[in-house]
């Protein structure tokens, strides 16, 4: 990871984790803290940044995800898409070198998915390394450099996004894409 061999129980695991951001399915925001406080939490309490500096950086990140006007709101006052964008800002506040996304749109209403994907697309355009678990095949095809298809905990197919998603070779990948891209049973070509 990051060019280093990592043993599961090694001391370098903690150091490597601090170089990564994580965005979960269910946002995991602190309900008793405002949006701004949620974004400031890690830099202040984990990294020891001065609160004034963390606040300024958090406001910049909230602007980046389109939520500067919600800085004083609490998570319960936000839509799911807004909460997920706060979660992205919170992860970015730790200045990660790479970000992990675990189904970031699966808990959202369909009309809110686009806002979250737009933020992720911006991160990709800025060069952020992202590992994304997703069923958003259009997004994966558009943004991913590489796609890995997992089944039963194992990678059954991997390669360039256009190859894996446009011309899958493994029967399980073909079946999955057929079901996701053609839920009505249309079995014509996937490309």
Roles of regions detected by a PLM:
Residues 1-161:
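ABC family nucleotide-binding domain
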Residues 163-191:
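C-terminal boundary and immediately downstream tail of ABC-type ATPase nucleotide-binding domains
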